[in-house]
UniProtKB/Swiss-Prot annotation:
It comes from the Eukaryota. The keyword Repeat applies. Residues 19-149, 173-301 form the Galectin domain. SUPFAM superfamilies: Concanavalin A-like lectins/glucanases (SSF49899). GO terms for molecular function: carbohydrate binding. This is Galectin-6. It comes from Mus musculus. One of its GO terms (biological process) is defense response to bacterium. Keywords: Lectin, Repeat. Pfam families: Gal-bind_lectin. Contains two homologous but distinct carbohydrate-binding domains.
Length: 301
């Protein structure tokens, strides 16, 4: 079963370098960009460019450039009319050989940069964001995923993702699904299974009741349980999966889509399982709960 991302959400898994991709519809305030990668052991530099065009010599509205080669700092700058402006800099938040999560949020007055869940820098706009057409990434790093949020959706039968994602939410996480589930609605959950993890749970609850329409329960090193809790009783467990992405110390990108007669769940762009609806009043399924032995990178509901 092929994975079709929800409109407004554009993931790329294990992209190769150099990474150069157009931003559908161009850049605008409210967009977010999530980059998951690993700094190489011999890292000297890497960069992320919000570029005005696809060519290597194009102007750059925002140049984000970590440098380990004797500087151990991050340089921020803008290239306008072929000339670099005045550099801004801050001390290095990355470590050689270590995994990182990097988020860029396009705000009205600046780019907000978040590194590993902590606010890192705000870079004021020197060029109008509407001029930016491409995202470029290259250097001494390995990429696991790059995700665009809030991009201009292409024509599709799926409803667009509404509202911005919540980055690095605390646990237990409780989120309201405004309007409940509807057919083709998609929920995105990206997280990290702790190295010592035993279990965690993702629950879609029904109103203020105790009912759970869909219970997803990875039991690390054992199985992946799916079930429902209705009228005070658990239903029949389902455990069969082609593969289990929830290993200790593993990142995951989970997409949960509501179909006419079932939930369709994908992990890292690969179909994981289906779960037939046991609770039919989909709009009453209006709360998402997540808790257990994991950390959350973002939730988009």
């Amino acid at each position: 079963m092929a994975y079709v991302p929800a409109p407004g959400y554009q993931p790329t898994y294990n992209p190769t370098l150099p990474y150069k991709r157009p931003i559908p519809g161009g850049l605008s305030v409210g967009m977010s960009f999530y980059i998951q990668g690993t700094a190489k052991e011999n890292m000297r530099r890497f960069h992320v460019n919000f570029a005005v065009g696809q060519d290597d010599g194009a102007d750059v509205a925002f140049h984000f450039n970590p440098r380990f080669d004797g500087w151990d700092k991050v340089v921020f700058n803008t290239k306008q009319s072929g000339r670099w402006g005045k550099e801004e800099e801050k001390s290095m938040p990355f470590q050689k050989g270590k995994h990182f999560e990097l988020v860029f949020m396009v705000m009205p007055e600046h780019y907000k940069v978040v590194v590993n869940g902590s606010p890192f820098y705000e870079y004021g706009h020197r060029l109008p964001v509407q001029m930016v057409t491409h995202l470029q990434v290259d250097g001494d790093l390995e990429l696991q995923s790059i995700n665009f949020f809030g991009v201009q959706p292409a024509e599709t039968k799926y409803p667009a993702m509404t509202g911005p994602p919540v980055f690095n939410p605390c646990l237990p996480y409780v989120g309201a699904l405004q309007g409940g589930f509807t057919v083709r609605r998609t929920i995105i959950i990206k997280g990290y299974v702790l190295p010592t993890a035993k279990t965690f749970a993702i629950n879609f609850r029904v109103g203020s009741s105790e009912d759970i329409a869909l219970h997803i329960n990875p039991r690390i090193g054992d199985c992946l349980v799916r079930n429902s809790y209705m009228n005070g009783s658990w239903g029949t467990e389902e455990r069969m999966v082609a593969y289990n992405p929830f290993g200790p110390g593993q990142f995951f990108d989970l997409s949960i889509r509501c179909g006419m007669d079932r939930f369709k769940v994908f992990a890292n762009g690969i179909h994981l399982f289906n779960f037939s609806h046991r609770f039919q009043a989909l709009r009453k399924i209006n709360t998402l709960e997540i808790n257990g032995d994991l950390t959350l990178s973002y939730v988009h509901i």
